[in-house]
Amino acid sequence: MLQLATYLHSQGISITIAQYPNFNSPDSSNHPELTFLPLSSGNLSVADISGGFFKFIQTLNHNCKPHFREYLVQNMSSDDKESIVIIRDNLMFFAGEIAGELGLPSIILRGSNAVMLTASDIIPQLHQEGRFPPPDSLLQETIPELVPFRYKDLPFIGYPIHQTLEFSITMMTPKSPASAILINTLEFLEQSALTQIRDHYKVPVFTIGPLHKIVTTRSTSILEEDTSCINWLDKQSPKSVVYVSLGSLAKLDEKVASEMACGLAMSNHKFLWVVRPGMVHGFEWVEFLPDSLVGEMKARGLIVKWAPQTTVLAHNAVGGFWSHCGWNSTIECLAEGVPMMCQPFFADQLLNARYVSDVWKTGFEIVIEKGEIACAIKRVLVDEEGEEMRQRAMEIKEKVKIAINDGGSSYDSFKDLVAFISSL
């Protein structure tokens, strides 16, 4: 959202960002050109996500709505009303409700891929037909309405069905009338899903990805980045390092984390591993590492608490990315032409992993067993298969460059977006 706001401001549009002080919000002093509105989220904090994601989002929306509505009413004269447009994250449905109540146009920004919206749209239908939650016999089957994705790739499998349906209907699909939909993707990456969305919603759909390549801002990371890892990468051979990062939310059992460590050690290849404090259940940081591996891992790799990911992926030493396949990580990886080892956990990560392995063919899903991990790293860094994946990833990288430059699809989409906002 900050990247989008920065771009729109550069095009002469006045921007106010509603933010939640309890949630690692950007430092307003770093962005004097923007106005920031702190919203009251009650006593809610990031730690409350552990109580359940659905409940967390519902509570956040409930707590923020009154303050946001009051701000708009107090600062909106009859003249101002004609110039106010609300751009909201798709999970912040309260902003869409307020826009409807006050007669303001609203635009939805989706930070996930396009197919996440189409998948969420069909879940209620699949449930009515007895196909969601999918029985075991269907898990490996392709969903006819969502080729080439399988039932096992659907988001929210394993969640209580009533919560999933409510999330799909109330939160994930824009039921409040929206003037347009923005998606951080590219036309050539998701043509089928984008066609379905445009046919279904009948509103302009602007593909404005990858945002991190189009708009340069200060780091938007919610964790402090350890930039010393770049100096370490500078000393490594080209395409010799596997970069491992499972995002900012995933939690691992000790057994899984130890298996990952053993696999990295067995591979005999260099690695840069992001282990967030508290990422492994029951441990503050890397205390889970077997004593027998500590020396070996220090000699071959580097473990950091957080890394400047876009800089790491662009580094010549990085030959593969072992990822949870969050959409930001996926599109950042594609933009640098790096093959992926996929370890998805939830939400759109399963869909992204399927894209990587079966559509774009720039990576594969990894089995969490030390021997399998060692073989997977070899596949990416050494084997001919890895080189073929790298070539396909580099082809996508070149297409991304074309898309974000003058005359490209994302470049033109941004220009069209500015004209559209100005017309509202």
Curated annotation (Swiss-Prot):
InterPro entries in the cross-refs: UDP_glucos_trans (IPR002213)
Q: Which residues bind UDP-alpha-D-glucose?
A: 248, 306-307, 324-332, 346-349
The UniProt record lists the EC number as 2.4.1.-
The yes or no answer to whether the keyword Transferase is present is: yes
Query: Kind of enzyme, top EC level?
Result: transferase
SUPFAM superfamilies named among the record's database cross-references: UDP-Glycosyltransferase/glycogen phosphorylase
Molecular function in Gene Ontology: quercetin 3-O-glucosyltransferase activity; quercetin 7-O-glucosyltransferase activity
Its domain of life reads: Eukaryota
The UniProt keyword set, sorted, is: Transferase
Entries under CDD domains matching the protein: GT1_Gtf-like
Give the family per the record: Belongs to the UDP-glycosyltransferase family.
Outline what the protein does: May glycosylate diterpenes or flavonols in leaves.
**PANTHER family (UniProt xref):** GLUCOSYL/GLUCURONOSYL TRANSFERASES, UDP-GLYCOSYLTRANSFERASE 76F1-RELATED
Identification of the protein by name: UDP-glycosyltransferase 76H1
Name of the gene encoding the protein in the UniProt record = UGT76H1
